[in-house]
Amino acid sequence: MNMPPVAILAGGLGTRLSEETDQRPKPLVEIGGKPILWHVMKHYAAYGMNEFVIALGYKKEAMIRYFLDLHACESDVTVRTRDGAVEFHERPGMLDWNVHLIDTGPSTMTGGRIKRLARHLGNATFMLTWCDGISDIDLLDLLAFHRSHGKLATVTTVRAPSRFGYMDIGDDCGVRRFSEKPEHGDGWINAAFFVLEPGVFEYIAGDESMWEREPLQALAADGQLMAYRHRSFWRCMDTLREKIQLEELWSSGKAPWKIWR
């Protein structure tokens, strides 16, 4: 089965995690010695999804340097000091990813970033997520659910604190209404693991468009947004407190999102 490419939004300022993001972009903030973005990508790669299209913005140079250096840092290396010749030696378990790093501007909104990735994603189904959310979602089951209903968009939903946007979901998993801010704290919320068809780009006006507002609201109103309910682990690393909690889970050796070997 051909796997869809994975679009990842990684260009935001990360202001709620300023203790870390003053020095580095949020995607490179580390959990267990690896960037949070690495954890997100390992999750997708565990399901055979190895083609990544990453939207850059804030501190894009640091992001590019990280991926340029990644092969060298993952390899054993021989350096010949006489002439500076370098030879890399593969090690077992080395990453096998194709990563496209796309500059989507320093202040482009989430919808605008997605639209700027359109020409790099092709004319087929694609996955979409953010750089700071980790989960144990079965991505093949999510993809199968999306393909079963024939709509333009699938959003993964979870139960979580009331600071997240609320969705009114029908018995058939159709999203009847999408609200950026919740009206109460017991609804299903946007976990930002999407499966999308190219038709969603028509719902995005331009750089000032926030994906979580008009595009998702319009998709829901048109009956083109379906919800995949996830009842297991999901966390978003928005604050220093949440980073510390994820570090503790990783250090315990029982991180629920570590589904890879």
For the regions a language model picked out, list residue spans one by one.
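Well-ordered alpha-helical segments embedded in enzymatic catalytic cores
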Residues: 36-39, 112-116, 215
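Conserved beta-loop-beta/alpha segment of the NTase-like Rossmann-fold superfamily
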Residues: 62-170
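A structural signal for short hydrophobic beta-strand segments in well-ordered beta-sheet cores
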Residues: 28, 166-169, 216, 227
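N-terminal glycine-rich phosphate-binding loop and ensuing alpha1 helix
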Residues: 2-72, 101
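Acidic-glycine-rich active-site phosphate/pyrophosphate-binding loop
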Residues: 12, 166-175
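Catalytic-core segments of class I nucleotidyltransferases/pyrophosphorylases
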Residues: 122-129, 134, 138-147, 159-162, ...
